[in-house]
């Protein structure tokens, strides 16, 4: 059925990053099921070729409620939903950094580092790792740690 020169590679679930999360600078967002607390199985995993930890962290990716283009509620699943949530968190941190006279002009690397500092981590898991990155994104904790509270 197959040609004799066809071979199958040994699959490795820890080498499944795709562009743009495989690049150095962009924030790589993995996915998790926020109800069960487990990793979203279709979430890409693994460090970059330059051994940069990716994903940076995980965000909700299963059963995410959103507003559809017709104004109706829709349910989304996938790391695109997780990335949208993380993008909203980045915008929130940018706004926070520039409000109330702070005038902090934060770049994407700084915002990513702020979010990483606030990640929730399971004490039984070693971080960073190729599945969870630095943990579960927690914007409130990130801002509290950044602000020194």
Question: Model-found features: residue ranges?
Answer:
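Hydrolase catalytic cores
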Residues: 62-127
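C-terminal domain-closing interface element
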Residues: 127-149
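Residues immediately flanking
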Residues: 31, 61, 139
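Active-site-adjacent substrate-recognition loops and nearby beta-strands
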Residues: 2-24, 30-53, 66-77, 99-101, ...
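Short, flexible micro-motifs
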Residues: 33, 49, 81, 91, ...
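Residue-level recognition of conserved structural "scaffold" positions that shape functional pockets
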Residues: 53, 85, 95, 140-142
